[in-house]
């Protein structure tokens, strides 16, 4: 099998990627905070993780779970709601739709799972 080298942000050295479980690879990326139209920083993260997801799928025979969250509760969202006199759900739903359109335009694969923060508030509090 070909090896994949990634930069370890802790050691700042390139290291061979060695999964904990070769039969089940997990990849997590922080997705957007949906208070305003997506920007180039969101696109960069999308493309970088899309490439990594595709490479891991090839190297490990598609045994990759890619989770990318959507932060749909945040001070910036509340502020945008107040400034624009717009319901929080209207803002977040509109921006999520634009984000997904951008993902499609960039030809990024959909993540395996895309949870919203509001769907997991209880679990976050318990952590």
Predicted regions: what they are:
Residues 1-127:
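N-terminal Rossmann-like or analogous alpha/beta NTP/dinucleotide-binding catalytic cores
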